[in-house]
Amino acid sequence: MDLLKIKDPSFMKQLDIKELEALAADIRAFLITSTSKSGGHIGPNLGVVELTIALHYTFNSPKDKFIWDVGHQSYVHKILTGRANQFDTLRKHGGLDGFPKRKESIHDVFETGHSSTSLSAACGMVIARDIKKEDFYVIPIIGDGALTGGMAFEALNHIGDMGKDMIVILNDNDMSIAPNVGALHNVLGKLRTSDKFQQTKTNIDKLIRKIPTAGEKLADTAEKTKDSLKHLLVNGTFFEELGFMYLGPIDGHNLEDILTNLEIAKRARGPVILHVVTKKGKGYQPAELDSRGTWHGTGPYKVETGSFIKSVKTAPSWSSVISNELMRLATADERIVAITPAMPVGSKLEKFAKAFPERFFDVGIAEQHATTMAAGLATQGMKPFLAIYSTFLQRAYDQLVHDVCRQKLNVVIGIDRAGLVGADGETHQGIFDISFLNSIPNMIITMPKDEVEARQLMVTAFDYDAGPFAIRYPRGNGLGVELTESNTLIPIGEWETIIQPIDAVIVTFGPTIQLALKAADQLETEGYRVGVINARFIKPLDETLLHQMIKQKIPILTVEESLLKGGFGASVLEFIETNNYTDVAIHRIGLPDEFISHGSVPVILESYGISEAGIELKIKEMLAQSEKLRAKRL
């Protein structure tokens, strides 16, 4: 079938089971070919092909509402709703989003990106539906990994208590980005392997008779349907105790089974959970055999071999630099422990976990728990390192304020993926942490300019004993500088003068130091003597150096790959105001007060002037303005 000609899902209603299976094969082939060029979340999407087809066949989108938890598994949904012809722009600047996007299609009714949100959103939708006396189905699709998130439990509790009609699809592939952990994961494993996977008619009747009016007829139909007896499982006690009707587990790649059970779920009253067992990467062997989460999300790859097409990398990743230093420090200090909320692979903590299994804790998708657990460890003299992506740290804001910072507990926070992350877009950009951490008392915020300084900040952080210490580091690879001895302590709040300022100064931190240095070099060839300051301590500021530069009337340009509102430059402006300085020439470059869309990081940075050319232009504008002011005074 020509998938590029699909306009909406209505065509599927005319297809028989064989044609639906052929459609599934075509979609798999398309996904593999397409993502081999663009990269993307290929593993999750190959696992939900039949499920997504069955959902669109059974229900009527957009009247009926699909909510894709996390949203990375929505590619098949996008194809069936008329967006296959945009897949060559997938995750590119201005192109097709890798997650559901309301402005992209009327079929994307709720935007996702972080996990465990779908059930709460669905809860709100069914309440609104019933208040307005409307008639449509609400179907959240949530994975077994996302179901471990605390927010999902809160929603299950409320939905079960309300008893309103809703169909929850539990997409159980036994594999999130990293192996699932926790008691609920063990419950699901028992359900998958239970003897009651082979059900008797008596047990099926017990479930189906909860369905009003049509219960008797459906029981007879189920008896005649191939394999239906073994797929309606009574022993979903956990969900039933919460007030849900439980169906499953069923084979998530058997269209007949899925369609039959969706029809049963449609006729039931009250909340229903349909437990669908799928295989992540289904239909593409390299992805099917993946046990580490490598094929969860990828860059371009060769279809024939399953090998990734990698850009030339001459340096280890920032995550590796941090985790290797953590290993070195933990070898010498048994009080150091590592905590991650379901990101051991991305944060490069697998070696630590192997070397120190009793001091490594993957708590699952539980950022709030991870943060307060770190606080608890700190009260007992341990030295916890919380490795967490910037975008996920915002989920633990109250715990940072109430449990960590308020008590001045010694928790080292490794803020991974700080700054722009590119293709994953709005929901994953690490651009808010400076703004929301800046306002919390007792918090130290840092960011290294290179690998050596990263190691030095790690040493400094674990030596610091007066409260929490955050180290930000970006996605991607370091600069490749030689890793010299790293036991040097950096005085708290001390910046580094890399180039002495004369005409103007660029004050920045992290990766943008390199942009500043290149801009300063170019400006020097044009006769401008511009200094570069490494503001490795974002909080506290180096007040001594700031006083000095301001008194010398040196124009200041702050540059940051983060939000201007509440950001580093805003802190410098606040310092100027607090100290009653007037007539200070200061400008800021950074990100505006908006959500930043997907695309390559260099393209996004360039569009906001966070580039060598952007810095050069702003410095020239500042100096020209200073000359005009000077001339006026004369």
UniProtKB/Swiss-Prot annotation:
Q: Known Gene3D superfamilies for this protein?
A: 3.40.50.920, 3.40.50.970
GO CC annotations, alphabetized: cytosol
**Which residues participate in thiamine diphosphate binding?**
72, 113-115, 145-146, 173, 284, 367
Tell whether Transferase is among the UniProt keywords.
yes
Bound cofactor: record note: Binds 1 Mg(2+) ion per subunit.
Quote the EC number.
Answer: 2.2.1.7
Record-level Gene Ontology MF annotations: 1-deoxy-D-xylulose-5-phosphate synthase activity; magnesium ion binding; thiamine pyrophosphate binding
Q: Where does Mg(2+) bind?
A: 144, 173
Q: Which Pfam families match?
A: DXP_synthase_N (PF13292), Transket_pyr (PF02779), Transketolase_C (PF02780)
Catalytic reaction list? D-glyceraldehyde 3-phosphate + pyruvate + H(+) = 1-deoxy-D-xylulose 5-phosphate + CO2
EC main group: transferase
* SMART domains attached to this UniProt entry: Transket_pyr (SM00861)
Q: Which InterPro entries match?
A: Dxylulose-5-P_synthase, THDP-binding, Transketo_C/PFOR_II, Transketolase-like_Pyr-bd, Transketolase_BS, Transketolase_C, Transketolase_CS
Which coenzyme or cofactor does it need?
A: Mg(2+); thiamine diphosphate
GO BP term (any one): thiamine biosynthetic process
Q: Which family does it belong to?
A: Belongs to the transketolase family. DXPS subfamily.
The record's HAMAP family line, in alphabetical order, gives:
DXP_synth (MF_00315)
Quaternary state and interactors: Homodimer.
What the protein does comes down to: Catalyzes the acyloin condensation reaction between C atoms 2 and 3 of pyruvate and glyceraldehyde 3-phosphate to yield 1-deoxy-D-xylulose-5-phosphate (DXP).
Q: Name the NCBIfam families for this protein.
A: dxs (TIGR00204), PRK05444.2-2 (NF003933)
The name this protein carries in UniProt is 1-deoxy-D-xylulose-5-phosphate synthase
Task: Tell me the organism.
Answer: Listeria welshimeri serovar 6b (strain ATCC 35897 / DSM 20650 / CCUG 15529 / CIP 8149 / NCTC 11857 / SLCC 5334 / V8)
- Provide the gene name from the record: dxs
